[in-house]
Every structure is written in C-alpha cells, then in structure tokens.
Regions:
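Structured C-terminal helix/loop/strand segments within mature extracytoplasmic catalytic/sensor domains
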Residues: 2-8, 30, 169-202, 218-280
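Active-site SXXK
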Residues: 40-68, 242
Length: 280
C-alpha cells in the first residue's frame, strides 16, 4: 500500500473532513487531499503573524526589545495560554510576546503582538508570499462562536499555503532569495525556525513520532476542528513537511469519544505514516 493510499485510508475512516498536504523533503514527492481548500486556520495562523512581525523588525519599523505590559483587558475573550491567569502588570519584551504566542499559543501574547502590527498588514504579507487562501480577519475568535460557524467569521488558510510558508522559512536558513521573499534577515529567519522547534504542545504531528524527533510546528484548535502544521526532522535534517486540517468535527463521536480526540489522533496517524513510509 502506497503512502498516499495509507494517508487517504486514515482520512476515510473518520466521518469528519481531513485536508492535508505532505512534502517529502528527501525526494520532493507531494501528497495532498483538499490541500487548496480554504479552511479554518486556528492558531496555525500565528506562524505568518510571527513572520510579519519579524519583517517589520528587519525593516526597523518595530523594536523586538520594546517593553510590553500585560493589562487585564488583554485577558478578555482569551481561552489559551497562561498569561490570563497571571497578575496584570508583568512587563515582557515584544520578542517574548511572539515567543508566548508561538510556543504556548498564548492569546494574551497574540493580542500584544497584533497591537503592534495590524491584521491588514499580516494579511497583505501572506498575499505577497502567494498564500492565496489565507485571510486574516480577526484578532481573536469570539468564545461564543458556534460550532457550525461560516468561514468568513474566522481567519482561514489552506494546507498548501502553510506548506509554502514553512518551506520558505526552511529555505531561508541558507537562501538569501528566500530571506528576501520573507523580508526578514538571516538572523530573524533562524530565530523563527528555532521558535517553531520550541513548541511545547506535543499532540498532533508529534504524538506518534519517536519522543526525540524534532518538529518545528504550530498547532491550532477551533470550533470546527483541530489542525497542525510543521517540519519534521530526522537525524537533525529536514525530513518532511506536513500540514493537516480537520473540519466538521462533531463534539462527540458515535462511540462517545470526544471529537477533538479523534481529530488529533488522525493527525498523529498521518504523521506516523509519513515517518515510516518515507524512510523505505
């Protein structure tokens, strides 16, 4: 059974929609399923926010060392991260706010960041990179958002758009052309990749890989599903890129299992097949 057949079989097992794109970085082989379909981004959107901030810093328009104060208002409508449980008045750098947004998906930190670059700027940045199906629409999705919300009520992306972004970040580790495309210095591109590697959350892509496997990724969750997008390494070298988006996931499956559990398990299985199949 081919890798592509195995990946599609995993998706076919579930009643919800799974869209993905994988790229074997050893051979260039690509496998996709609905990879160009616009889908809720969840927090995978934050990788492009990070890169837009780094571009602004490279251009001297913002200072990553500027102090940012945690104010109580920033915790309103926030359902992720740890800052919302902490005492207002804490001061961190903008760089640390970007780090918190990425490695813990802290939406207090996301608000801090998006008060220094605009959604319009981030959205335009994505379009300039060729991310045609990525649309940044809101700072933070409202907590009361319905599970069957329309696409236009959230930020959206596609599996292919996220592969494009991750590949460009990876290329920028050595390619001046990729650095220029991102609008970021070599140092900023190196920092971005390391920040993706510092991801704390280990479900999704990482869940069925060897514990020591290095993954540079950003996961996400939304009312309609779970998602994860990352670069998987083997023996310290880039191995494959995988971006996966589940959609129309029920709150509870027919057997009583929470829908998000099966969504994350599906992402883990897809990653595991790539890890095993691309090695043979």
């Amino acid at each position: 059974m081919t890798v592509a057949a195995q990946l599609n079989a995993i998706c076919d097992e579930q009643p919800f929609v799974t869209r993905f794109m994988v790229r074997n970085l050893l051979t260039g082989e690509e496998i996709g399923r609905g990879e160009n379909v616009e889908t809720p981004s969840g927090s995978t959107r934050k990788t492009s926010i990070m890169m837009a901030v780094l571009k602004a810093a490279t251009e001297g328009r913002i200072d990553l060392d500027q102090p940012v104060t945690y104010e109580k208002r920033l915790a309103e409508e926030v359902a992720s991260g740890m800052f919302r449980y902490m005492t207002p008045g804490i001061v961190i750098s903008l760089r640390d706010a970007v780090t918190g947004m990425m490695v813990l998906s802290d939406n207090v930190c996301t608000k801090m960041v998006l008060e220094r670059v605009t959604l319009e700027e981030v959205d335009g940045y994505c379009k300039s990179l060729g991310m045609a199906n990525t649309h940044h629409r809101f700072l933070i999705p409202p907590l009361a958002l319905a599970a069957d919300h329309p696409l236009k009520t959230v930020t959206t992306t596609s599996a292919a758009d996220q592969v494009l972004l991750l590949q460009t970040i990876l290329d920028a580790q050595s390619s001046k052309l990729a650095q220029e495309k991102l609008g970021c210095s070599a140092e900023a591109c190196a920092w971005a990749l390391q920040t993706l590697k510092n991801q704390v959350l280990r479900y999704g892509i990482r869940s069925r890989l060897p514990f020591e496997a290095v993954v540079a990724s950003k996961s996400g969750r939304g009312k309609r599903g779970r998602m994860d997008a990352g670069i998987v390494y083997k023996n310290a070298a880039p191995f494959f890129i995988i971006t996966t988006y589940t959609d129309d996931v029920a709150q509870t499956m027919a057997d009583g299992t929470p829908g998000y559990t099966m969504a994350l398990e599906t992402i883990g299985k897809l990653s595991q097949v790539c890890w095993s199949g691309f090695q043979s």
